[in-house]
Amino acid sequence: MKQRTYIAIDLKSFYASVECRERGLDPLDTNLVVADESRTDKTICLAVTPSLKSYGISGRGRLFEVKQRVKEANAGRQHDAPGHRLEGSSYLFSVLQENPSLAIDFIIAPPRMAYYMEYSTRIYQVYMKYVAPEDIIVYSIDEVFMDVTDYLNTYKLSPHDLAMKIILDVLRRDWHQPLSLQSGDGYCRQAHTGR
C-alpha cells in the first residue's frame, strides 16, 4: 500500500480572528472573546484570541471566568504600575506591553455562525485551487485534512512548501487569518504564520 501524505490546516481561534478582521484589527494583537453576553456571564466562550489567552484564559471558558481572570491580571498590573494606579485601558496587547499603567480590556463579540460559515467557505475555495474536493476532508468549520500525495509531484513541492503556498494564498486575500499547519508523511512539522 502506498504511503499517503496529508496536510492539516487549522484556522487558529477562527471565530475570534474573523471578528477581529471584520473590525480591522490584528487577531494576534487584539484581546477579543466571542460570546453571547446577552445570555448571562455563564455563557460559554466560543473563541478567544491568542493575546487574551496569554493572560491564562482558556479557549473554551465561560464569560465570567474571562472577566475574573482579566480582573486578577489588572490587579497585578495595578500593583506594579507607577503609583499603583491604572489610567485608561486598551484591548491591544502591544499597547498594554508598552504602557504598564493601562488596564487590560477586551472586546466581547456576539457570535455570528452563518457569517463564520460563509467565511470558511471562501477559505475552502482557496484550498480547492490546489487540491480537488475529493481529497479534502473537512473536519470542522475551521479544520481540514488534505491528501496531497498525488499533488506533490505535480507542484514539485514538499508537503510543507505546498502547505505554505496554500496558506500564503489565503493571507494574500487580505483575510489576515492566522493559521497553524501540520504536514508530513509519518511525521508532523508545525509552522505558524500570521499577518
Show the residue positions of the predicted features.
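Gly/Gly-Pro- and Ser/Thr-rich, intrinsically disordered tail segments characteristic of DNA damage-repair
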Residues: 1-195
